[in-house]
Amino acid sequence: MLNRVRRTKIVATLGPSTDKANNLEKIILSGANVLRLNFSHGSSEEHKKRAKKAKEIMFKLNCHIALLGDLQGPKIRISKFKKNSIFLKVNDVFILDANLNEKNGNNERVGIDYKKLPNDLNVNDILLLDDGRIQLKVIKIEKCAIFTKVIIGGILSNNKGINKLGGGLSADALTEKDKKDIILASEIDVDYLAVSFPRCADDLIKARELLKKSGSNAQIIAKIERAEAVFDQNAIENIILSSDAIMIARGDLGVEIGDAELVGIQKKLIRTARKLNKVAITATQMMESMILNPLPTRAEVMDVANAVLDGSDAVMLSAETASGKYPSETVISMAKVCKGAEKVPSINVSRHRLNVEFQSIEEAIAMSSMYAANHLKGITAIITMTESGKTALMTSRITSGLPIFALSKHKKTLNLTALYRGVIPIYFDSDKDGVEAANEAIILLCKKKFLFNNDLVIVTQGDIMGKIGKTNTSRILRVTY
């Protein structure tokens, strides 16, 4: 029987730290399952080099890891100050001026990069700058100038972000830079593309259309960052159904809805994504102290563990691996926490979709197989022989504590399944069909020391290998050799 394998996946962001020495290979060997290219930072050439190097390492290590391109989106920012920063006191009047030159900010006013901001605001609106560290109340709007009173002061430096409490800013989800980066993502051949600040399903549909037009079939991740996206259950479901996965980007989302609300929203988003057969990534400041320190705080350990207990498919590292001093150590620490949390019995039981009508034969096979896995004593693994990865995804929506092996001859499919909770991608190419192919798959997994004599496994497959959407069979087989 296979020893316990970590089920929750780890997304690691690439950057200057992973460019050094052999740090990129180290984070892969330490347990990174998805490599994120953050298009908010770095040049297109840097991203191309990182993607090329990552693929070379994957080939060398014979492993399957997903590449994720992350669009910057319409991050609304102040411009620059003459002296780089100012100090705002409580009750000061401070002006955000759309007409002010980019580098002429002073103690009284600063420019803004989103010129339509005055049109989106009303008197008494609260603006949150620098992730909420500075708070301003709108007291007057005159043409292009927003007059505010400082509620919470402090140091304000160049190019800090602006959010509106409760959301409602109308900036388009896809900027001109994003459209260029979609082409870059296609050239790099990413497996996933994350769309920042989508307000509704239409933003994601447009991104998918542009991606396909550029020649890519990458899957779309909706980054949940705006208050509008979580306004009610209907808004949440519309966003999730229009994407292939969601990323709970807790930084901007927490600023817009408040940290206290964020706790319940995180759980609701993960629960809804799983219910709708979608993938959920929990992100932002998960082990931020490890940017400078070799060990996480206990609060960070609990945060990661709770994301695992909530049912996240993956937990994400940002600056910790991109620019931190301890990139591989951070991945190792996160992996340990995930495995620890996964020992909790309550997360290995699921009633997912037991009371709903299945939408396809594939889903019926996947759900019945997982029901059998959870109720037949002695099952040690699930094997899904898959062309597109869809059956592997659906089986991974039910929590069982058992490893799910996704076997495919398509490397793109294997890369996609690297993000799914509990799924282990394995390259497999057979000219056999039916039980002969199933037995070949078992032999391969035995050779790789994943299965052992007398193990009991469930195999899902189609009658004919090599056809997408044809999974119609589930077998329970005993390993004998």
Swiss-Prot record:
Catalyzed chemical reaction(s): pyruvate + ATP = phosphoenolpyruvate + ADP + H(+)
Protein name, entry field: Pyruvate kinase
Activity regulation behaviour: Allosterically activated by AMP and by several sugar phosphates. Belongs to type II PK.
Keywords: Allosteric enzyme, ATP-binding, Glycolysis, Kinase, Magnesium, Metal-binding, Nucleotide-binding, Potassium, Pyruvate, Transferase
Cited InterPro entries: Pyr_Knase (IPR001697), Pyrv/PenolPyrv_kinase-like_dom (IPR015813), Pyrv_kinase-like_dom_sf (IPR040442), Pyrv_Knase-like_insert_dom_sf (IPR011037), Pyrv_Knase_AS (IPR018209), Pyrv_Knase_brl (IPR015793), Pyrv_Knase_C (IPR015795), Pyrv_Knase_C_sf (IPR036918)
NCBIfam families attached to this UniProt entry: PRK05826.1, pyruv_kin
Ligand binding (Mg(2+)): 225, 252
Record SUPFAM superfamilies: Phosphoenolpyruvate/pyruvate domain, PK beta-barrel domain-like, PK C-terminal domain-like
GO MF annotation terms: ATP binding; kinase activity; magnesium ion binding; potassium ion binding; pyruvate kinase activity
Pfam families registered for this protein in UniProt: PK, PK_C
EC number: 2.7.1.40
PANTHER family found in the cross-reference section: PYRUVATE KINASE
Family per similarity comment: Belongs to the pyruvate kinase family.
Pathway of action: Carbohydrate degradation; glycolysis; pyruvate from D-glyceraldehyde 3-phosphate: step 5/5
Lineage: Bacteria, Pseudomonadati, Pseudomonadota, Gammaproteobacteria, Enterobacterales
Subunit structure: Homotetramer.
Residue sites binding substrate per the record: 36, 251-252, 284
Enzyme type, top EC level: transferase
Annotated residues for binding of K(+): 38, 40, 70
Segments forming a coiled coil: none
UniProt organism field: Buchnera aphidicola subsp. Schizaphis graminum (strain Sg)
PROSITE patterns, per the entry: PYRUVATE_KINASE (PS00110)
Residues annotated for ATP binding in this entry: 38-41, 77, 160
Cofactor: Mg(2+); K(+)
